[in-house]
Amino acid sequence: MMNQDNPYAMNQTCKVCGEPAAGFHFGAFTCEGCKSFFGRSYNNLSSISDCKNNGECIINKKNRTACKACRLKKCLMVGMSKSGSRYGRRSNWFKIHCLLQEQQQQAVAAMAAHHNSQQAGGGSSGGSGGGQGMPNGVKGMSGVPPPAAAAAALGMLGHPGGYPGLYAVANAGGSSRSKEELMMLGLDGSVEYGSHKHPVVASPSVSSPDSHNSDSSVEVSSVRGNPLLHLGGKSNSGGSSSGADGSHSGGGGGGGGGVTPGRPPQMRKDLSPFLPLPFPGLASMPVMPPPAFLPPSHLLFPGYHPALYSHHQGLLKPTPEQQQAAVAAAAVQHLFNSSGAGQRFAPGTSPFANHQQHHKEEDQPAPARSPSTHANNNHLLTNGGAADELTKRFYLDAVLKSQQQSPPPTTKLPPHSKQDYSISALVTPNSESGRERVKSRQNEEDDEARADGIIDGAEHDDEEEDLVVSMTPPHSPAQQEERTPAGEDPRPSPGQDNPIDLSMKTTGSSLSSKSSSPEIEPETEISSDVEKNDTDDDDEDLKVTPEEEISVRETADPEIEEDHSSTTETAKTSIENTHNNNNSISNNNNNNNNNNNSILSDSEASETIKRKLDELIEASSENGKRLRLEAPVKVATSNALDLTTKV
């Protein structure tokens, strides 16, 4: 027969006679003989005589032709109906689908019936009406089958518990039938076994086409179960394959009454839970959370963090640099105010260098910051990176010049006294110079902003600023600011405002001073190196005894009259030098350079700096100690009164 040609047909058997099914015909898997019989007899009921055996004839391959009445009855019970023929020559899947769709007639289960009725459709009509030979019996039978089909459809939809009534009806229908009827319909295995073990599938199995294996419907159905499962999974295209789908979905056990229904339902159950759960769960959980988290993650990590990191880097870097620049500005202001070196000496060189070294002495970590401070200070100063080398050279040259040339007399001891009673400040950290350093540290940022202005304005009013600073040696930056405008332009005032900042932000101020004066920047780098060497010397300088301070004062007394401002700067520088030997040398040189710069122009100072770069390096070691002593001497001279008080 045809089913031999069709591999799926081999898996499926005729629901009526048990032969291999040729395909899904009239809503059930049937062989060609039963298909043609039903087609002929359905329209010619008059030709069919009543059963002589009270309708108890067994329809099988051998005796299927013995009783037309029983054969037609079984065809109807299997679910065959003339309505199934109106689909014409269509695929088995399509026929099953359409049949189940009609039987269910429920919009809710329509789509479910389409997919599920493909498998359950064949049996849905035949399941309940098996007892009646009337063609209407098929429809009448649908009373239970539609629920069964609907249940199957729902099971496919993944709502096995959605319609318990349907399952109950299917189970009730299956269980209500006698064992014999179930055997006749093949529902005993499909309904009872399937419905009890797999209620979702059980209901479809009621109408399953396989239900009518009169001889051994259960056995056949159980054997067919696997094919049904395979067919159902593969969505059979062949006549029998669609029948398998029909049995798989419709009753899952219509064809595979015992084993098959259970398996299809399991598959259905698996599909049903997975489909609804994964889609809502996956869609909602993975889909929703990712959108929810992704925007924040992007905003936070890429958006905020990069921005924050970049901002923080920019802010943090500028902050130390700005603080250092402010410290440098304060140092410049103090230097200018104390010694008027800004006017005499290049505004960016000696004053800044002194404060840079001073701050370096106080804050040795500044050398690490120095590169960034150089960059920021370069921005502050037009010289930029190129000025670094020039600044170093100029700074060192200024230091050498200041050392070689005695600082020009400048009566500005009070400014230095407030800024640096270098030795006393070092010896007595609570001294005004220490306070000023703290203030300078506090006002590093202000000093940076003011450092540039201080450099410019300090050159003009360094002497006045020095006087003002001398008036208020250890005062808060605000006082220094007030003094600065009084003595100088408000630009130098930031430098004055940050005497504390200088002490607090020694490294930052030195770096900022580097930035404030590009020429000083290279010097600051050199001084940073010197600072490392001077760190040891700083301790020695700090260890200077009051006697040394007094002796320095005595020696510095004449110098005080000569150049209180320069000596105060030298004292500050000496404090810085005490912190750093080389820095102290460079600071003393810077103080001398401040004096020399006041005498010499900026160009001359730069030239002398270039000349004395090597000398500074050579004399750095020797001058480190001398400058330590000299710096205290200068400090004492510049701040003799304050030094005495502080000693």
Swiss-Prot record:
Biased composition (Low complexity): 200-223, 232-247, 502-519, 580-599
Coiled coil residues, start to end: none
Zinc finger (NR C4-type) residue numbers: 14-34, 51-75
SMART domains listed in its UniProt record: ZnF_C4
Biological process, per Gene Ontology: epithelial cell migration, open tracheal system; negative regulation of DNA-templated transcription; regulation of mitotic nuclear division; regulation of transcription by RNA polymerase II
Primary location group: nucleus
Gene3D superfamilies: Erythroid Transcription Factor GATA-1, subunit A
Residue spans of biased composition, Gly residues class: 120-134, 248-260
Compositional bias segments (type: Acidic residues): 520-541
CC per GO annotation: chromatin; nucleus
UniProt-recorded name of the protein: Knirps-related protein
Species this protein is from: Drosophila melanogaster
